[in-house]
């Protein structure tokens, strides 16, 4: 199984909700316009962890995802390639790498509207039949 999800636009409201709730203090998130990062990036970058959150939601909302998935139980080998920015449209490319009686294993890639890789990781889902 391999699939590509819909795209989600990352908005300034999303950025403020995430950074305010988590109380980010690093200047790239708290004072971007006056930081050295504004010389490197034209737009406000998002915290990388937000992409993991978005990827989980995109995977879950995919209508052909296996119906016997109980829970996402592992994320590993996370590699951030480049930041996502406000107004980017991001989506998930997911590829099933292995299936066992208890688990599904996927490779996830989060990309932007320019098909640039933002994030790669491996995830493991527990199947319903194995929940206690």
What are these regions (language model features)?
Residues 1-3, 84-132:
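HotDog/MaoC-like acyl-thioester-processing domains
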Residues 1-72:
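Hot-dog-fold acyl-thioester-processing enzymes
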Residues 40-43, 52-96, 105, 122:
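Hydrophobic beta-strand-centered segment that forms part of the acyl-chain substrate-binding groove
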